[in-house]
Amino acid sequence: KKDWRKLRELNHLSEVFDAYDTFVIDLWGVIHNGIKINERAMEVVDNLKKNSKKIVFLSNAPRPSAKVINFLLTMKMDKQYLSNVMTSGEAAMHAINQNKFGKTFFHLGPPRDASIFEKVKENKTTIDSCDFILCTGLFDEDDADLNKPKLHENDLDYYKKFLSKYTSKKLVCTNPDFTVHRGNKEEYCAGYIAKIFEELGGKVTYYGKPHKEIYDMCFKANEKVLAIGDNLRTDIKGANNLNKDCL
C-alpha cells in the first residue's frame, strides 16, 4: 500500500515529467465531462506529447475503443493524441467474442452500447435462456428488450427485483464505475448494478479499472507510470494495487 507520508503537492504536472515514461490518463472527469473537452487538461496532454511521453487514455466506458475515439473526435480532440486508447468495453469485447463466459448472453444496458457485442449479436437472447448477463449500464426507457417502457434510471429497487431471480447466472460488468457526471447530471453506471447483483449473492466478473487485467493491456511492468484520474475507487485504487504512482 502507498504511504500517505509520501504524498507530494504539485503546482503543475511538468514538475514530474522527467520521473515517468508513461502517463495513464482517465477520460471522463479529467479530459471531458461528457459534453465538452477540458481545454486546460488538453494543454497538459499537449505538453506531454511535446516531451515525447507515452500517453494512454484509459476509460471505463462500456464500449469499444474505436467508439470512444470517435466520440472524442466529435468533441474536437485532435487525433494526434489518440494513438493509445483503451476502454473496459474493449477488454470485455475480446473475452465475449471468444465465448469466455459461454455463448449466449442477455444485454442489461442501453441500446447505444450494442457495439460491444456487434460480432456476436446473434447470440443475444432472453435472460431466462442466457449463459451469462452482459451488463453495460441501466436500461433506457425506450429499450425494446425490456417490454416495460417508462422505467426510470433511478429506480434501483426495480433492478434488485429483476435480478434477484437470476443470481445463479454469471454477470459480466463492463464499467466498474458506480456513477458518472454528464455535465451537471449524475447518472448510475454498470458498476452500481453489479454491486446490487453481488449483494443479492451473485458473482460478477469486472472489466476496467481498478482491476489489473486492463492495465496489462496498457503498459509493460518495467515502464515508469503515473496514473491520473478523478475516482478514488477506480483510478487511484487501480494504481495503488499495481504499486504505481497516481495523481
Predicted regions and their residues:
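HAD-like aspartate-dependent phosphatase fold
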Residues: 1-247
